[in-house]
Regions:
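Penicillin-recognizing serine hydrolase domain
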Residues: 17-78, 173-314
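Short, glycine/proline-biased beta-turn/loop segments that scaffold the active-site neighborhood
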Residues: 107-137, 230-239
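Second-shell loop/turn segments in exported
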Residues: 80-88, 134-141, 149-153, 164-172, ...
Length: 314
């Protein structure tokens, strides 16, 4: 029987929907008519003997395909399902991008932050990305976005062009920003992660579900990040109203975080959901990767929902 490994932890302006990354797939779905090393036991499950607060889970909790991991509030260990391996993560990459921007340029409640002025080269880059079918938001030379607006464009409609803008603004160059992404990953214990770009477009950006849980946990400690990913939509100066690709938001206890999808990564979703388990309100922070389906965004979302339903039913 496949089981769980427990890992200790410290601590629509877009022409395409989220995470296409230049490869065909359908638009984000709307599921609702209304407005997420140890020793082996006899069962074959792995357990970490230095922590007793994480329960051993039956294999039926986990998605049948791809990989997944999660942690519940009150626990110090990540529950890790089978098939963990470094794999493309598509736009889930943007969790780390946003985390680094907010780490380097913190925002408090009510603050919009510095202003970023978009250039002709940013517009040319956007046109190139649009031609490749990437997820972008429309921009114009001279357009001004606050840091908060840029993060909203990054995280809601999943704009690859804004990921590039933020990377250069934060670190001076994309290459330097990617170096900072990898340094942050190492500091968080994300040992099976390698970032090569700030948007997740490149298939060489790889990670595991367990590693991504670590950065999601850190990002969700930042109130501005948590607030942005809980928004169903936002309005940008040129792009206008853009929708969050997370259509589970506000349903079944899901409060964010980030979708991702392409043909290499499949359907991916980094999420947080709040459910009542054993009479107690419990926060579940998790990630599913590599979910199959013709509609990859839907596959990631529904893979996460099904897993959370099973967790809550244990």
């Amino acid at each position: 029987m496949l089981g769980a490994v427990l890992i200790g932890v410290s601590g629509c302006g877009s022409p395409t929907a989220d995470g296409t990354q230049g490869r065909p797939r359908s638009s984000p779905p709307s599921f609702f008519s209304g407005a997420p090393s140890g020793s082996a036991s006899a069962s074959g499950r792995q357990s970490a003997p230095d922590h007793a607060d994480a329960q051993a889970l039956p294999s039926t909790v986990w998605p049948a395909h791809g990989q997944a991991a999660f942690i519940e509030s009150g626990q110090s260990q990540i529950q890790v399902g089978p098939n963990q391996r470094a794999a493309p993560i598509a736009s889930v990459t943007k969790v780390m991008t946003a985390y680094l921007v907010l780490r380097d340029h913190p925002l408090q409640a009510g603050q919009d932050g510095p202003t970023l002025t978009l250039s002709a080269s940013d517009v040319a880059d956007t046109a190139h990305r649009r031609a490749l079918g990437q997820s972008i938001v429309s921009i114009a030379a001279g357009e001004q976005l606050t840091e908060r607006q840029a993060l909203q464009a990054l995280l809601l409609p999943s704009a690859n062009n804004i990921a590039a803008v933020l990377a250069k603004w934060d670190a001076g160059s994309t290459d330097q920003f990617v170096s900072q992404m990898n340094a942050a990953a190492q500091s968080l214990g994300m040992n099976d992660t390698r970032y090569t770009d700030p948007s997740g477009f490149e298939q060489s950006t790889v990670s595991t579900a367990a590693d991504q849980v670590r950065v999601v946990q850190q990002a969700m400690t930042l109130p501005v990040f948590a607030s942005i990913v809980s928004m169903p939509s936002t309005t940008l100066p040129v792009a206008g109203t853009v929708a969050n690709t997370d259509t589970l938001l506000g349903h079944d206890g899901f409060v964010g975080v980030k979708t991702g999808s392409d043909n290499a990564a499949g359907g991916c979703f980094a999420f947080r959901a709040v459910r009542t388990i054993g009479g107690k309100q419990t926060t579940i922070t998790g990630v599913v990767l590599g979910q199959p389906g013709a509609d990859q965004v839907a596959a990631g979302l529904m893979g996460a929902k099904a897993m959370v339903d099973r967790i809550a039913g244990q």
